[in-house]
């Protein structure tokens, strides 16, 4: 008699999960592997809060929350936050840090597609930051995010453009020269052109409202938002009301 096959978990790259599981204990180390995320988080948070008209009192979902850097900061703004991730260890770190910080965040281990099947149209704001390039089917994630947001609600995506410049800066520069992130963090083949992302958005109820680039200056060691989406970029969309 054949042994039962383990259940299939759709749209999960277990090698990607393993990368982040291995370094999860250092998620909140401001000088560790996740230092860039800590550095850019005020920019991400400010962009999301400003374009959402503030986060206080809103129900927010952070898709691919990892160790909870963005999720916790949105909760500090007065939002009711759910953090979603498929990595067990990052979620344990996120839960412990929230407990130690006295911040309430509901962390859940499941895919965004599974969550959408149970919680359609329940969130005022959905964020999906630096996650699309780590899953086998990013378009499926976009569809699920569109299902989860309320009509008139906000959905934010951030990812990396796919071109020679982004490979040089995000892979060669960030991983091998500046060593800002661990080697192997990114695979340029999984990067997503803005036109591709907007095409997926257009196939849902979402409508693009704004796009901005995230830029790093190695001379001043600073990040800023501004025109130009040839490397890192963020997209703000809203769910259309029938």
Curated annotation (Swiss-Prot):
Keywords, comma-separated and alphabetical: Methyltransferase, S-adenosyl-L-methionine, Transferase, Ubiquinone biosynthesis
List of residues binding S-adenosyl-L-methionine: 44, 64, 85, 129
The enzyme's E.C. designation: 2.1.1.222, 2.1.1.64
Disulphide bonds in the chain: none
An example Gene Ontology biological process: methylation
Reaction equations catalysed: a 3-demethylubiquinol + S-adenosyl-L-methionine = a ubiquinol + S-adenosyl-L-homocysteine + H(+); a 3-(all-trans-polyprenyl)benzene-1,2-diol + S-adenosyl-L-methionine = a 2-methoxy-6-(all-trans-polyprenyl)phenol + S-adenosyl-L-homocysteine + H(+)
Highest taxon listed in the record's lineage: Bacteria
Keyword Plastid found: no
Protein's UniProt keywords contain Zinc: no
SUPFAM superfamilies membership: S-adenosyl-L-methionine-dependent methyltransferases (SSF53335)
Pathway(s) it belongs to: Cofactor biosynthesis; ubiquinone biosynthesis
Described function: O-methyltransferase that catalyzes the 2 O-methylation steps in the ubiquinone biosynthetic pathway.
Name assigned to this protein: Ubiquinone biosynthesis O-methyltransferase
Gene that specifies this protein: ubiG
């Amino acid at each position: 008699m054949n042994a039962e096959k383990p259940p299939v978990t759709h749209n999960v790259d277990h090698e990607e999960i393993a990368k982040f599981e291995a370094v999860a204990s250092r998620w909140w180390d401001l000088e560790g592997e996740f230092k860039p995320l800590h550095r850019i988080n005020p920019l991400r948070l400010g962009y999301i809060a400003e374009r959402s008209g503030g986060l206080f009192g809103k129900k927010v979902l952070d898709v691919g929350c990892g160790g909870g850097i963005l999720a916790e900061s949105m909760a500090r703004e007065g939002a009711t936050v759910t953090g979603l991730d498929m990595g067990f260890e990052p979620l344990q770190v996120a839960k412990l840090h929230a407990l130690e910080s006295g911040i309430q965040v509901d962390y859940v281990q499941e895919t965004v597609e599974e969550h959408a099947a149970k919680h359609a149209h329940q969130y005022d704001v959905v964020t999906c930051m630096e996650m699309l390039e780590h899953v086998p089917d990013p378009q499926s994630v976009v569809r699920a995010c569109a299902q989860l947001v309320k009509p008139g609600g906000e959905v934010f995506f951030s990812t990396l453009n796919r071109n020679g410049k982004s490979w040089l800066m995000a892979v060669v520069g960030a991983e091998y020269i500046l060593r800002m992130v661990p080697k192997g963090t990114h695979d340029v083949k999984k990067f997503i052109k803005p036109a591709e992302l907007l095409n997926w958005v257009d196939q849902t109820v979402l409508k693009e409202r704004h796009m901005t680039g995230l830029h790093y200056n190695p001379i001043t060691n600073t990040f800023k938002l501004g025109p130009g989406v040839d490397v890192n970029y963020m997209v703000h969309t809203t769910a259309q009301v029938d």
